Amino acid sequence: MRKNCFLRLAALLLVALFIGSLLPLSSMAAPIKLSYANFPPAPTFPCVQMERWKKEVERKTGGQVAINTYPGGTLLGAKNMMDGVIAGQADIGNLCMAYQPGRFMVTNATALPVGFPNATVASLTLWDLYKKYNPKEFAKVKVLTMFTCAPANIYAKVPVRTLEDLKGLELRASGGVAQVLSALGATPVAMPQSETPEALQKGVVKGAASSLETLMDFKYAEICKYVTIFNGPVYPFAVVMNMDKWNSLPKDVQAVMAGLGTEQAWWTGNYMDKHVDKSVEWSKKNHSIEIIKLGKKEQAEWNKLVKPLIQNWITQAKAKGLPARAFVRDIRVAKDYHSRF
């Protein structure tokens, strides 16, 4: 009897060993640990999308991957994000391409004042542009997704209904948004976001131009009672992975990450748009702000004044041997397509 029990136990062990040998090694091994660097503070939308992507990858790989996230520049800063990922200081990094306009010429074309209606449309357009042209500046990394912030709009202590209202108006702005405001006749003033509330209170600036979640997040609605919608520029972002690290991943893990590219671009844009909507509703309910929408004729006048900015960019890009007009054409086509949904 004891001999038969021993034989049955041995047989069960052999079966277990055989079944175990059939399991993929990736499911038996310890989780693959990856580091993900980000530069803005944890509550901001680039970090919110980072945490969402982390959870999706960990869930869809069945625990094969464990991702440690580093917001707020704790691992890599904004200006050295791309080079830091290439060097392997972080496995994954999120960068704002607008901070290096000359380096990311193709994808930064989405920062031109083409009139994106929201972040979802802009994010999907950016992703389409990248996938079509596969710019050489990303040859040393694996691009996981791209997305944008919401379009910049004007909020001020005085109403802006026409170009005449905008003329000479001091507004806090930076980068491409500042260039657009200058073209429209305003006076852009560069300053950190943290200094803007005091500058508004003291009258150093009469308002600002940025995406409208700041009305609630920075409480600008307490001071600026007028919002003018003109669908200004967006800032493009990219999430990239060290190429050696990417090549070391199991094929099934690569497939999960690659499959999230378009979904993550849409999710981030949609999250941003919902946050903007919430901010605007909060501002209307709690601070009675007025939303000013330009009429077709007035909007056409604004668009006419920013056209030279687009033409200047085309000239610069063509000088670098890039098919600049094709980029702008494709951006407009993609914008119109994604705006239908």
Where are these regions (language model features)?
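N-terminal secretory signal peptides that target proteins for export/translocation
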Residues: 1-7
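Bacterial N-terminal signal peptides
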Residues: 10-24
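Bacterial Sec-dependent signal peptides at the C-terminal "C-region" and cleavage site
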Residues: 25-29
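N-terminal secretory/targeting leader peptides
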Residues: 30-120, 136-341
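A gly/proline- and charged-residue-enriched helix-loop-helix capping module
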Residues: 117-133
